[in-house]
Amino acid sequence: MPENPSPPLLVVLSGPSGVGKDAALNEMRKLDRPWHFVVTATTRSIRPGEVDGVDYIFLDEPTFLDMKDKNEFVECAQVYGNWYGVPKSQVTTGLDSGKDVILKIDVQGAATVRQMAPNALFIFMVPGSFEELRDRLSQRMTESTPQMELRLRIATQELGQAELFDRQVVNSEDHLKEAVADIDATISAEKQRDGRTPILLL
């Protein structure tokens, strides 16, 4: 594995639901990079094929709310009726090990992280077209029609915030590897930037 000589970087990967963030993370894990992938905690039900502790940390609501009360999350929010939170230990463990930390989070959560770690690298994934996004959500077959319509309405609002991010990466249909290569290059360029300061959670 390559050395990581510059200060560890916090990379915040965001974008609307269905844009392909999970697929991008799966491809990024295949690269030989000194990266630590944050696992988000959630109270939502596990989906077919997901693994507890790998895809998400699945918690019941009382356990989650207890952690929230103890201020054990970098940020947490209720999204689509379920709680999601980033355990502080997931971020600090990665940074303390000297690895760059990759954090996948929704747009609402990214705004909170920006306040706590303004010198992080914020990357926003966008679909090739809104029709592609609609098709991806339809193919999931895990959403009811009202839920899908809600996600599409929220996605429209979130896409309007793309300019607030440091970098936008297009994930077009059948071009996932190109999107991941773009993310990889963006991280490498940020690592080489002069004057970058260590990540401190405010």
Task: Please give the residue ranges for each predicted region.
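Extreme N-terminal, non-catalytic leader segments
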Residues: 1-10
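NTP-dependent small-molecule kinase module
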Residues: 4, 142, 157-202
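Walker A/P-loop
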Residues: 22
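ATP-dependent small-molecule kinase phosphotransfer cores
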Residues: 42-101, 108
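Conserved phosphate-donor/acceptor-positioning beta-strand/loop module used by diverse small-molecule
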Residues: 101-106, 116-139
